[in-house]
Amino acid sequence: KNGSADECGELCFALPSDYKFNPDSKSNFEVFLMIEVIKHLIATRDNIGFGYYLEKESGFSSRTAFNGAMLVGMGDYEKEQQTMILDGAELSFLELLPLRPMELNFRKAHSAVELLNLFKEKLVMITPFISTRDDVCNVVAKM
């Protein structure tokens, strides 16, 4: 978002194929996370794109340790394959990557690419989202 009506974004959040949504449950962490992120993105005046991150100090849920999120490209596709022109506007496809506290702190001090490289080095998949996944910064030495 840079004030231009010529840019739009599509936010994706890949869930496991066996994910069970219960509309009557308040424990649908993934749904509430997405709602919180969307509310933040609508309200912010910051430029939103690859690597954009946000923090929710109280966390997104008492059931999880995730207190941040970062927007990343979808898969290992080239940038040109993650955008398209639709009715004269550029549409960018971004994926939501929930972050644990140490990952968020790492992102604050480093680039999005450096954090994504940690995921690769530690062999931790970012899609589909698994709420019990390892914290990629858990064993990173302090810099």
Language-model regions: role of each:
Residues 4-7, 11-143:
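Acidic, proline/glycine-rich low-complexity IDRs
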